[in-house]
Every structure is written in C-alpha cells, then in structure tokens.
From Swiss-Prot:
Name used for this protein in its record: DNA-directed RNA polymerase subunit beta
The gene coding this protein: rpoB
Protein function: DNA-dependent RNA polymerase catalyzes the transcription of DNA into RNA using the four ribonucleoside triphosphates as substrates.
Taxonomic path: Bacteria, Pseudomonadati, Pseudomonadota, Gammaproteobacteria, Enterobacterales
Reaction(s) the record says it catalyses: RNA(n) + a ribonucleoside 5'-triphosphate = RNA(n+1) + diphosphate
Organism: Klebsiella pneumoniae (strain 342)
Protein keywords: DNA-directed RNA polymerase, Nucleotidyltransferase, Transcription, Transferase
Signal peptide: none
Length: 1342
C-alpha cells in the first residue's frame, strides 16, 4: 500500500484478513445526492423542482381563454454564507426565480389563435440550501432532515391472520396505495363476500365499483367465472365435460359414456380417472336432471316469443325454471363453474348483496359514501368517481407505484400511467380471489422491497408542490377576472404560500430535526438516520412488534444494532455502511459477483427484491488465491434463510464483513464478542461522548476512524496536493502542485479554520492544524483536526489504564473509581460554550435601553461592564453577575406628597425604569469569550457596537489583504519564471520593483502572450479584492434584519471548563457505562511492580452477566499496543540507531497470520521512520475490523512482542498498604468516553421559588427551578413511621397551603418557630372537579 507523507505520520496496524474490495463510500451521500437531485435542472422533468413545476403548470383559466405556462427556473446566489447565517440567526437560502409565460387566446377566433404572449421572471420565495456537510441552516441553527422509511406505493395483498373474527377465519384483503390520492381497499368478510372501501370509509359490495365502471351483471360474471354448459337432448340432460374440473370431487352419480362406466357413484375422482376420460376423448356426459338444481345461470335468458325475462343472470336454477327454459326453446344453458376448493362463488354471492343494478345507482351509492348528507346529482356523482382514481391531478401512483403494481400482477412492462385503469382494478380483484382460493401468497409488509426511503429532496419537492397547488387556485381566479391585457405574470403569482410551505417543512416538520452535534460521529449518524415516524409514516402507539423487529432483508441495508432504547425502538434505524438507495428509493447493498465458482471483483448493487432470487455467500468464506471457495459447502443466505450450499450454486458474495452494521456499530472493536443488547448501548453512547480538551486516538480501533473523521466535515481536508506554504492557528495556505492547477490561476489554496465556536449541544468546535511548514500534501490529506479528531482519526475519548477488581465498594453497581491523575492531566476536561442573549424591545411605554446606568445596583455589580453596559471580553463571571445592563420603562406610579418633595429636592428620576438586565444563570460560571451586538436599521449604534464593527472591518481587511498577498506572491513567482525563460536576466529583475515586471516586453511571442495573460490575471485579482472588501464592508456596517419590535440583540458567549468529577457518567464502547463514585489520590490507587498506578478501577462483576466480552479483549489488546509503544519509547530514549527501530517496528506490523495490510518500512526515509516512532511512543494504534478482528493467538503474540505476560494479568499492589493483592488482576488499556450527562447540568436545589398556577404546588425540574416531588410512596413511608406532623408539614405548608406558607414566613421572621397548617389548595381543586361533574359537595365547619 502507498502512503502519503501525512499518512506516514501514524499508521494503524490492521488485523483484518479479508481484502478490501470496495472502499467505504462517502458517508453523507444519501443527503447530498438527494438534495442535488431536487435542485438540479432536470431536462426530462422526472425529479426535483422541474417535476413540481411541470406537474402544476400550465394553469388554464376556467374559460380557457388564457393560460400561464412555465418556461424555466434558476436559483440565485445566497446573500450570506453559512457562517454569517449562523452568526446572524438567518436561514441559508437562495432566491428562486421562475420564468413564466402568459398566453392570451382570441375569444371569437378558432381554437388556439394567440392574441398576446408576455414572458417574465417571477420571484417565488427562498429555497433553503444544503451546506457541504448535508445540513441546513434554518434561523441560524443547523438542522438535519432525516430520511423516512414509508410503505411503497403499489398494491399489497394481506390477511388479518385470523384475528378479526371470533371464528378465527383468515380474511384476505388487497390495498392499492398511490403516492398521492385515495386508497382503494378490497376485503373479504366472514361470509366470503367481497367488499370495497375508499379511503378507509364505510365498506360497499365490491361489484359496485365494477358497475360504476359500466359493467353489467353478465359481464361481471363473465370476467370472474368459467362456464359449465348443459344441453337438453331428447329430454335428457347432457353436460359438456372438462375433465380437469372434476379432480378431487366425489361423484354423485355414475359417470358413464358410450356404455362404459368411468367412475362409480360415491367414489372420489382421481387423476387416473381423468387421464382415462381424456384418453377416450369424452366431451359430453349425461347427468341426472337434479344435478343442475342449485347451479347459477351465467347470463340473462329471455322468452323470445314474449320478450319476458325468464331467468336473470346470477339466478339459481331449479327444476321448474329448467322446464320453463326448455319450453321457451333454450336448449343450451350456461352456468357458473364453482366448487368449494379452488373456485369459490365469491363474486356471484357479492352480486346478490349488491343493492345497485346499473351504473347510475352505483355512482350514487359511492357518492353517498364519500359525501354523506349531500344530495347526489348525476354530474356530481360522475365527476367525483372520475376524480377519485382516473384524474392525473388528484391521483398519482408514481413511477415506483406503477412498477410495484405491475410487478405484483406479474406483468411484463414496468412502466405505465400514474392513474388506474379498468384492467388494473379487475386484475387486483382477480388476484385477491386467487389468493382466497389458495393460489399465491400474501405480501410481507415489513420486507424492505415493500418499504422505500423518502429523502430530503423528495420531501422538499412534495412540500414545494403543495405550495404550488395553493398558488394554482389563486392564479385560476386571477386569470378569470378579465382585464388580462394590463396584467403581467408577476401580478398573478403570490410567493407567500410557496415560501410558507417550504418554511413550514424545514422549520417545523417532524423530520426536520435539530442536529445532534455532540461529536463528529453523532453528526454523521444523524444524517444517516432512517425514521419510520413522521407525516405519512407510522405512529409510536400504533406500531406493533413486527414493524420494529429485525427483518432478514435488513442485511446490509439497515443496521440491526443501532436503534434507540425506549418507545422508538426499531422505528428509528441507521443506514448500514455500504447501503445506498436506487432510483426508486429502495435500499440496495453491494455484492461481489461469483461466476462459475470464482469470486470476481465485479460489484453489483442488489435491492431486497432482487436479492431474494440469489444464493449469497458470507464475507468470511475462505477463498484461495484464485478466488475459488476452499470448502465444498459454503454458508450462504437464500430467500432470507441461512444454510449450506455447494460452491457451484453460489451467485454472489458479501463485499465486506462490516456490511451488516452501521457506522456507529462499525467503530466498536470486537463487536463480534458482545451481546447485541450491550452493543446497541455502546453504539448509542458513542454518540453522546463530549469532545475532550486534547483528543486522543483510540489504541484499539476498527479502521473506520479515518473515514468518519474525514466524511463528517469537522476536519479540513486538502482539495488538491501541494506543499504547505504558511500555517497558523486560523489559516493554512497550500501552494498547489503544477499538475493539479487549472490554467490561469494563482495556484494557491487557502483554508480558514473554525475557532472556538459553539455547537448545537453547547460543546466547543475548534480546528487545529496538524501539518507543518514545507510538508508535501496530497489530495484528501487531513490538514487540520476538528473536535474529537486526532491526526485525522476519530477520537471520542481517552485511553485509560484500567484494572478489573473491586475496591472498597467504590465500584458497586457499575460505579467507577478514577485516579486523581486523570484530573491533573486534564484527560477528561471539556469546554462548553453557552450563548446568552439580551433583547432590547420597543414597549408601549417606550424603548428598553441597554446601559450601564441601572437603578439600585452597586458599583461592584457593574465592575465588569463597559460604558455601554456590556460585559468585557475575558471577564470571569459567576452565577448572578450582570452581563448586559438593561432598563425597561415602567408605568407612572402615584407618588405620595413626601416622595414628590424628595424628588423635587434631589432630582431623582430613577424610579420610572426597572432593572431587566441579562444575568448569568445560577450555577453557571465561566469566561466571556465573545460579544456580538445586532442593531436594527435606523437605530443608533452604541459605542460597543461600533468598536466591534471596527474590529471586524480591520480583521476582514487583514484577512483579505493577506489572502491577496499570498495570491500575488504565487502569481509573481510565475511571472518571474516566464520572464527568465523569455531571456530577461535574473539580476535585472531582482533590482526592479515587482509591479514594474509586467511592463517589460519579450521578443518571444508565446512568452509575451503568457505574460499578458498573467498581467490580466493580476488586474483581475486586484479588482476581485476590491469587490470582496466592499461586499464585506457593506455586510458588516449594514443594519440587521431583526424581528418586529426588537431594537437590539446582544449575544454573550461564555466558555465553561468542566473537569471530571463524581457524578459524571462515563462509558466504554461496549455498553459498559457507569457513574464516577470517587476520585482517588494517586498514591492510594493499585499499582504494579514498577510502581505504575492504574487510572480507573472497574467492577469485574459488570462483565459476566452482561456478556460484553469485547471489553476484555480490547483491554488485553490495548495493553499489548501500549507495551510496544513503551519499547519504542525506550529505544528512542536510548537513542538507538534507526535500523534497530525500523526492524522492531517492522516486526510489529508484520505480526499476525495472513493480514491484508502490508507496511514496508524500507520505503520510508530515516526521518519518516523517526517521526513514525515519535507518534507510536504512547502506543501503537491497532485496527481490528468488525467480524474480522484479531484472534486470541495474535493478541498473545503481540503481548509477547511487548514483553508482557500472555495471560493479560499482572500482580498489583495496594497503594495504601503496599501489600500485594491476593491474585493477579486483568490490567490493560480501554478507551473510555465521558458522556454528555454531566452532574453540573443535573445538580439542583431549591428552598422557595415559583408555584404552579392551579394547584399552587411547586413546579418540577431544573429548568423551572422546581422542587422535589414528595410522591405517593414517600407519603406511605411517613405513614408507616407514624410521623404525622412531618407528613402534615410536607403536604401543607411545604407544598400548596398558600396562607400557611406566608404565615410560616412571618413566624420565622418573628422568631416564633411554629406552623399553622390550613387547607391545601389542591384539595380545593379536587372539590371543584367533583362539582364540575354535577355532584355538590360541601365542607362542614365543626
């Protein structure tokens, strides 16, 4: 493998055996591709905005004299970039401009004569844009649109599994689900009649819909039944014989023909009998006359002479009827063929219960069901039925729906109309009847072939279409109002409904979620989340067990591990690592093609439907070097079951062992040794890890760390190769390689880094460069680390030296004992940034004012404010300190004469304002790191705002001019090269000032042209600089667009440093979570023979019952990795020669049987080897991929190489007494995370505070500054003790006895420590509730 210069800094030893056939795909593509499809101009008009416009336009007036046509659209440039939007609290969006054409036709002239055409570009609101990382900035906060897993449109056949009716009879049903429009359900009732429902309303006999489609009873019977023909010859009854139909029947008479008896009466008719009848070519047999009684006529029989209807279709025949028919000359009688086994008489029975008999009555019946209470007219009934399923405006199956529909009915073509046809409805009924007759299977609705993914683009398009449809109505009205000659397209279109629909979706849809920004992994997982909830999806309460369960088709598509615990379990899933969606929105997963028993590197993506037809081998099947399977029998999956197949039956093979799991689960080493429940907790808890002050790469990883760190977008990644020309904390400049430059550019890439910004979860986002000056860079190298990344690898926690042993009960019930050293070294110290805002509004009594002149506040409280009343940057503040001084005018109060006199003497006027300053919340303390002031247009800016503005302008100018200098330097170096090549002496150039170089002329024409080109670029560069500076200046100095009534907003950012402390929650990656019980002095911690103390002591009882053995293997492997690091460290300290180092590190990389990773240190220079060794001092990082990890033997080999005991256990000594512990203890290195459940955020105390309005009881929760609930069980406890007075106090004066509370206060002030409990307020509430039920209840005074 070839490593770039940056990758050589630290190479993770990989224990994976299976070759990596397919690279891990870009992890955010599900979001970015979907939105790209929405925004991109699509010439076919299949997707996105184009599809929405084409489906609504052209809009015609009611009269048809004019229409508004759509031509094209374009998206403008966003006003602010992403960072500016976040600071200002606005939406990152682009204006949508649509070119429309208004066509007016001549009224009197023939059809289609155009009178006038007007074309115009119309503004249609703002469309929020997706950032490069797959998020949206809505009102200044980053949000993610979660993809939805919903039932695919199409037709589904299902049964109630015998649960509806008490008899346990299985009732079958079919449901046609369109993408938009009414649902159509067919269902059997317990009497086997077929019914239809539209939109889950009242059910009607299914034949009504056929009559509404203009079928007569005869035609209906003709569609669904085969015929049995009887003929009357010589007063005998002959039946046309179709031998197949007799199979399984019992003969009710002798079956004979040509004097030969084929079946005797009472015998079962078998296949042998049928073969004989067919062989002798028997076409007719004679039947007794009684046999026809009970058969059903298949058509109307009319007496030719009188025209009287003797026997209508679907009537049961009797002997009398037969005689009548015979008399009127009907010798040939057709009846319906039915039997109890596989040709049920369902439709015939349904026709009998059908009250209608022609098209009109059927339409009226449907109208009554859909619009109860409205008087039906013929036109209304016809148009309602037409619009239900046969109008493109109201009904659309969509391409997916049509494809699923046709596949389900086994048709050949998969494309077709989006509306239903007569044939569609009839075929669905036929298939449903076939299933009832025992032919065919019902569908599995949890199969991923029947559920599809709706991503951002599609949902945004649907919302946009909703907005357009609202506009359409208004446009139709306007077009019909007349006076079109003066109107232009923009007078027709009101953009409000469109932007309202889009805004509503992005702002408040259930699937538009506040991004989880705890760490890079939580961001990526949130964007790859798949929810079954949301509009058009399931609800938590209704979702049963089956929907939530893992389905065989989830394999490689949806992760079976990562899902929340609690009410949403199984409804919210995560996309597997390699999964992607196909054009129809179904999930696909990649497989390697197997041809003639040889596994190729050809990759095919299969959806769940296609996968069912193949035999698929697992990724860990053993192959020889030619790609043949080694074993004769291979474990494979086929049709959702796993079993053994011979090697020549195999069609495909899994791509990778990680293919089953999601990104979160693929980061857990030794996942294969953990119980699934704990793995689920581990995957979920990694997302809650808080980024530590100094990120520390995991010693034991899975090799996915780099992919997650790079794809999450928190790191700065090189777009093009080159060398590092300049680097400081906030900017990296790369001089691009010649071969990667675009013609005619300066060849400089500038990366500006994010410094100390607040994330959605109040954690700190900060990027730090990890490259040095002059280093060569390749495309895709990581240039700067973000939060929780270390040298371009995800680093959520810290490597801790752990021991599994009890320690004085401090690790009882999963508690964690931590060494003081962890606190001293700031291993788990995190920075949290809080944003506090102060809003100055315009009130009825006058504007609020931000000022340092606050009434009744001492000097000390104002010491941290400047003259504008805003806190200084760098001030250390604690709870209750004033951050922004603000006063609000209050109404004039009536003053007493004395007060008036004092006022007159002292000129006091301070009492007409009250203090409404922004203060630091209780329990919070930190340092002010930034202040921002937003002022409304037209409001005078205060001194502080102007200072900030000045500073921003200076900074912007400095940034831009530095950028210009860098680009200029790059350009001039190229000019220099051209001039020297053109024959100008270097000495002469060095003496001339740079800007005079461009005036020199060259004799060589080609070189002169190049020089002129470069001169043009130089002018353009300067012009661009001026333009950019002006734009920046305008943005900084212009007023801000604030909400109505708001004059000023001051935002103060506090940085809080949180050290680890007892009560904080920590966890490993295997679901092993616990709370810190004690921080122990270093000298008391258990230590080994060398005196190295452990950092963390964990309870060994947490392992066996939880069955997460992965943590033990991780501990052993971590120990080995550290041991090798220690040996490298010792060699570096002794300054041994590079050859020895190279040899030892090479041994470590080569260890392990047939591993796929090949590291050849001979290709490294000495300097590179030394730098690699420097980075391996703290331990050699190791990758053990999921399901393909290090074996026990390999861990032992690695331990041996590090001179450590292969048991993984060492003798420890008690730090307090120095005595040796009784038996060896498992000690090693485990990766521990600090979770975002910090005791500081949860600790809370109250003595008095706010009370609930109705019950007058204290509120609950920290946010409301509430009390602790003394609940039912606590009351029982006091009752059991007999502590009557304590109980009385709890339930009255300490809770909701309003008078008692105030009396108590007075008593305490007076020094009288007694209480007088009264009536609790909640008792009055109870009385009122009883009275509201109409029961009078009165309390009698004694």
């Amino acid at each position: 493998m070839v490593y770039s210069y940056t990758e050589k800094k630290r190479i993770r030893k990989d224990f994976g055996k299976r070759p990596q056939v397919l690279d891990i795909p870009y992890l955010l593509s599900i979001q970015l591709d979907s939105f790209q499809k929405f925004i991109e101009q699509d010439p076919e008009g299949q997707y996105g905005l184009e599809a929405a416009f084409r489906s609504v336009f052209p809009i015609q007036s009611y009269s048809g004299n004019s229409e508004l046509q759509y031509v094209s659209y374009r998206l403008g440039e966003p006003v602010f970039d992403v960072k500016e939007c976040q600071i200002r609290g606005v939406t990152y969006s682009a204006p949508l401009r649509v070119k429309l054409r208004l066509v007016i036709y001549e009224r009197e002239a023939p059809e289609g004569t155009v009178k006038d055409i007007k074309e115009q570009e119309v503004y249609m609101g703002e469309i929020p844009l997706m950032t490069d990382n797959g998020t949206f900035v809505i009102n200044g906060t980053e949000r993610v649109i979660v993809s939805q897993l919903h039932r695919s449109p199409g037709v589904f056949f299902d049964s109630d599994k015998g649960k509806t009716h008490s008899s346990g009879k299985v009732l079958y049903n079919a449901r046609i689900i369109p993408y938009r429009g009414s649902w159509l359900d067919f269902e059997f009732d317990p009497k086997d009649n077929l019914f239809v429902r539209i939109d889950r309303r009242r059910k009607l006999p299914a034949t009504i819909i056929l009559r509404a489609l203009n079928y007569t009873t005869e035609q209906i019977l003709d569609l669904f039944f085969e015929k049995v023909v009887f003929e009357i010859r010589d007063n005998k009854l002959q039946m046309e014989l179709v031998p197949e139909r007799l199979r399984g029947e019992t003969a009710s008479f002798d079956i004979e023909a040509n004097g030969k008896v084929y079946v005797e009466k009472g015998r079962r008719i078998t296949a042998r009998h049928i073969r004989q009848l067919e062989k002798d070519d028997i076409k007719h047999i004679e039947v007794p006359v009684e046999y026809i009684a009970g058969k059903v006529a298949s058509k109307d029989y009319i007496d030719e002479a009188t025209g009287e209807l003797i026997c209508p279709a679907n009537m049961e025949l009797s002997l009398d009827l037969l005689a009548k028919l015979s008399q009127s000359g009907h010798k040939r009688i057709e009846t319906l063929f039915t039997n109890d086994l596989d040709h049920g008489p369902y439709i015939s029975e349904t026709v009998r219960v059908d009250p209608t008999n022609d098209r009109l009555s059927a339409l009226v019946e449907i109208y009554r069901m859909m619009r109860p209470g409205e008087p039906p007219t013929r036109e209304a009934a016809e148009s309602l039925f037409e619009n239900l399923f046969f109008s493109e405006d109201r009904y659309d199956l969509s391409a997916v729906g049509r494809m699923k529909f046709n596949r389900s009915l086994l048709r050949d073509e998969i494309e077709g109309s989006g509306i239903l046809s007569k044939d569609d409805i009839i075929e669905v009924m036929k298939k449903l009847i076939d299933i009832r007759n025992g032919k065919g299977e019902v569908d599995d609705i949890d199969h991923l072939g029947n559920r599809r993914i709706r991503s951002v683009g599609e949902m945004a398009e649907n919302q946009f279409r909703v907005g357009l449809v609202r506009v359409e109505r208004a446009v139709k009205e306007r077009l019909s109002l007349g006076d079109l000659d003066t109107l232009m397209p923009q007078d027709m279109i009101n953009a409000k409904p469109i932007s309202a629909a889009v805004k509503e979706f992005f702002g408040s849809s259930q699937l538009s979620q506040f991004m989880d920004q705890n760490n890079p992994l939580s961001e990526i997982t949130h964007k790859r989340r798949i929810s079954a909830l949301g509009p058009g999806g399931l609800t938590r309460e209704r979702a049963g067990f089956e929907v939530r369960d893992v389905h065989p088709t989830h394999y490689g598509r949806v992760c079976p591990i990562e899902t929340p615990e609690g009410p949403n379990i199984g409804l919210i899933n995560s996309l597997s690592v390699y999964a992607q969606t196909n054009e129809y929105g179904f999930l696909e997963t990649p497989y390697r093609k197997v041809t003639d028993g040889v596994v190729t590197d050809e990759i095919h993506y299969l959806s769940a439907i296609e996968e069912g037809n193949y035999v698929i081998a697992q990724a860990n099947s053993n192959l020889d070097e030619n790609g043949h399977f080694v074993e004769d029998l291979v474990t494979c999956r086929s049709k959702g079951e796993s079993s053994l197949f011979s090697r020549d039956q195999v069609d495909y093979m899994d791509v990778s062992t990680q293919q089953v799991v999601s990104v979160g689960a693929s980061l857990i080493p030794f996942l294969e040794h953990d119980d699934a429940n704990r793995a689920l907790m581990g995957a979920n808890m990694q997302r809650q890890a808080v980024p530590t002050l100094r990120a520390d790469k995991p010693l034991v990883g899975t090799g996915m760390e780099r992919a997650v760190a790079v794809d999450s977008g928190v790191t700065a990644v090189a777009k093009r190769g080159g060398t590092v020309q300049y680097v400081d904390a906030s900017r990296i400049v790369i001089k691009v390689n010649e071969d990667e430059m675009y013609p005619g550019e300066a060849g400089i890439d500038i990366y500006n880094l994010t410094k100390y910004t607040r994330s959605n979860q109040n954690t700190c986002i900060n990027q730090m460069p990890c490259v040095s000056l002059g280093e060569p860079i390749e495309r895709g190298d990581v240039l700067a680390d973000g939060p929780s990344t270390d040298l371009g690898e995800l680093a959520l926690g810290q490597n801790m030296r752990v021991a599994f042993m009890p320690w004085n009960g401090y690790n009882f019930e999963d508690s964690i004992l931590v060494s003081e050293r962890v606190v001293q070294e700031d291993r788990f110290t995190t920075i949290h940034i809080q944003e506090l805002a102060c809003v100055s509004r315009d009130t009825k009594l006058g504007p609020e004012e931000i000022t340092a002149d606050i009434p009744n506040v001492g000097e000390a409280a104002l010491s941290k404010l400047d003259e504008s009343g805003i806190v200084y940057i760098g001030a250390e503040v604690t709870g209750g300190d004033i951050l922004v001084g603000k006063v609000t005018p209050k109404g004039e109060t009536q003053l007493t004469p004395e007060e008036k006199l004092l006022r007159a003497i002292f000129g006091e006027k301070a009492s007409d304002v009250k203090d409404s300053s922004l203060r630091v919340p209780n329990g919070v303390s930190g340092t002010v790191i930034d202040v921002q002031v937003f002022t409304r247009d037209g409001v005078e800016k205060d001194k502080r705002a102007l200072e900030i503005e000045e500073m921003q302008l200076k900074q912007a100018k400095k940034d831009l001019s530095e950028e210009l200098q860098i680009l200029e330097a790059g350009l001039f170096s190229r000019i220099y090269a051209v001039l020297v090549a053109g024959g100008v002496e270097a000495d002469k150039l060095d003496k001339l000032p740079r800007d005079r170089w461009l005036e020199l002329g060259l004799t060589d024409e080609e070189k002169q042209n190049q020089l002129e080109q470069l001169a043009e670029q130089y002018d353009e560069l300067k012009h661009e600089f001026e333009k950019k500076l002006e734009a920046k200046r305008r943005k900084i100095t212009q007023g801000d667009d604030l909400a109505p009534g708001v004059l000023k907003i001051v935002k103060v950012y506090l940085a809080v440093k949180r050290r680890i402390q007892p009560g904080d929650k920590m966890a490993g990656r295997h679901g092993n979570k616990g709370v810190i019980s004690k921080i122990n002095p270093i000298e008391d911690m258990p230590h080994d023979a060398n005196g190295t103390p452990v950092d963390i002591v964990l309870n060994p009882l947490g392992v066996p019952s939880r069955m997460n053995i992965g943590q033990i293997l991780e501990t052993h492997l971590g120990m080995a990795a550290k041991g090798i690091g220690d040996k490298i460290n010792a060699m570096l300290k002794q300054q041994q020669e590079v050859a020895k180092l190279r040899e030892f590190i090479q041994r470590a990389y080569d260890l392990g049987a047939d591993v796929r990773q090949k590291v050849d240190l001979n290709t490294f220079s000495d300097e590179e080897v030394l730098r690699l060794a420097e980075n391996l001092r703290k331990g050699m990082p190791i990758a053990t991929p999921v399901f393909d990890g290090a074996k026990e033997a390999e861990i032992k080999e690695l331990l041996q190489l590090g001179d450590l005991p292969t048991s993984g256990q060492i003798t420890l000594f008690d730090g307090r007494t120095g005595e040796q512990f009784e038996r060896p203890v498992t000690v090693g290195y485990m990766y521990m995370l600090k979770l975002n459940h910090l005791v500081d955020d949860k600790m809370h105390a109250r003595s008095t505070g706010s009370y609930s309005l109705v019950t007058q009881q204290p509120l609950g929760g920290k946010a409301q500054f509430g009390g602790q609930r003394f609940g039912e069980m606590e009351v029982w406890a006091l009752e059991a003790y007999g502590a009557a007075y304590t109980l009385q106090e709890m339930l009255t004066v300490k809770s909701d006895d309003v008078n008692g509370r105030t009396k108590m206060y007075k008593n305490i002030v007076d020094g009288n420590h007694q209480m007088e409990p009264g009536m609790p307020e909640s008792f009055n509430v109870l009385l009122k509730e009883i009275r509201s039920l109409g029961i009078n209840i009165e309390l009698e005074d004694e």
